Amino acid sequence: MAKKSLIQREKKRQKLEQKYHLIRQSLKKKIRSKVSSLSLSEKTKMREKLQSLPRNSAPTRLHRRCFLTGRPRANYRDFGLSGHVLREMVYECLLPGATRSSW
């Protein structure tokens, strides 16, 4: 089980990412736009605005965690579980349709 503080930190990052998502997206779109007639100084101002946003609001700072244990590694997107928990649940027949492989 992961520390509760780490799980809360990840939830805080998710909230920040949702809050600043549209702002970050619009600034990036304006900077990357080839059609816009922005001068170099205007683009640098937009980059500074982008850099002034909180670091934890960037989507690259997010990390998937198992929703049962909070484990940050070996997560399966389809289930939202880490590999360890997924394996145990399959063995106990708690996931419908999932079976152990045998050949």
From Swiss-Prot:
Keywords of the record, alphabetical order, are: Chloroplast, Plastid, Ribonucleoprotein, Ribosomal protein, RNA-binding, rRNA-binding
Localization in the cell: Plastid, Chloroplast
Please state the span of the N-terminal signal peptide per the UniProt entry. Answer: none
Entry's Gene Ontology BP terms: translation
Under the heading InterPro entries, the entry gives: Ribosomal_uS14 (IPR001209), Ribosomal_uS14_bac/plastid (IPR023036), Ribosomal_uS14_CS (IPR018271)
Q: Does the keyword Ribosomal protein apply?
A: yes
* One term of GO molecular function: structural constituent of ribosome
Which GO CC terms are listed, alphabetically?
Answer: chloroplast; small ribosomal subunit
Superkingdom field: Eukaryota
Transmembrane spans: none
Q: What is its main location?
A: plastid
Q: Which family does it belong to?
A: Belongs to the universal ribosomal protein uS14 family.
What job does the chain carry out? Binds 16S rRNA, required for the assembly of 30S particles.
Subunit structure comment from the entry: Part of the 30S ribosomal subunit.
Protein's name in the database: Small ribosomal subunit protein uS14c
Organism from which the protein derives: Lolium perenne (Perennial ryegrass)
- Gene encoding it? rps14
